[in-house]
Swiss-Prot record:
A cellular component annotation (GO) from this entry: cytosolic small ribosomal subunit
Main function: Binds as a heterodimer with protein bS6 to the central domain of the 16S rRNA, where it helps stabilize the platform of the 30S subunit.
Family label: Belongs to the bacterial ribosomal protein bS18 family.
Subunit structure: Part of the 30S ribosomal subunit. Forms a tight heterodimer with protein bS6.
GO biological process annotation, one example: translation
Keywords, comma-separated and alphabetical: Ribonucleoprotein, Ribosomal protein, RNA-binding, rRNA-binding
The keyword Ribonucleoprotein appears for this protein: yes
Species, as recorded: Chlamydia abortus (strain DSM 27085 / S26/3) (Chlamydophila abortus)
NCBIfam families attached to this UniProt entry: S18
Single annotated GO MF: small ribosomal subunit rRNA binding
PANTHER family in the record: 30S RIBOSOMAL PROTEIN S18 (PTHR13479), SMALL RIBOSOMAL SUBUNIT PROTEIN BS18M (PTHR13479:SF40)
Name of this protein: Small ribosomal subunit protein bS18
PROSITE patterns according to UniProt: RIBOSOMAL_S18
Length: 87
């Protein structure tokens, strides 16, 4: 049987990213829920185009990501936040 010849290592350490343990800002602050009327807090978790930032970027826990998403959607429907970002 012919075995393939590999000149490169299987795991290339140059392209690995360092992982940082991000703490959920809501858990560390002791929040129980997120209010949809608190637009200043909600704007921190929305991109310039109006998209909700993912957990891997914000560091929000799974529980609070769901609560945060629901609060942002409620604020959008009531009119506190825009659906589309500002140009």
């Amino acid at each position: 049987m012919n075995k393939p010849v590999h000149n490169k290592p299987v795991h290339n350490n140059e392209h690995r990213r360092k992982r940082f343990n991000k703490k959920c800002p809501f858990v560390s602050a002791g929040w129980k829920t997120i209010d949809y009327k608190d637009t200043e807090t909600l704007k921190k978790f929305i991109t310039e185009k109006g998209k909700i930032l993912p957990r891997r970027i914000t560091g929000v826990s799974s529980r609070f990501q769901g609560i945060l998403t629901l609060a942002i959607k409620r604020a959008r429907h009531i009119g506190f936040l825009p659906f589309v970002g500002e140009d």
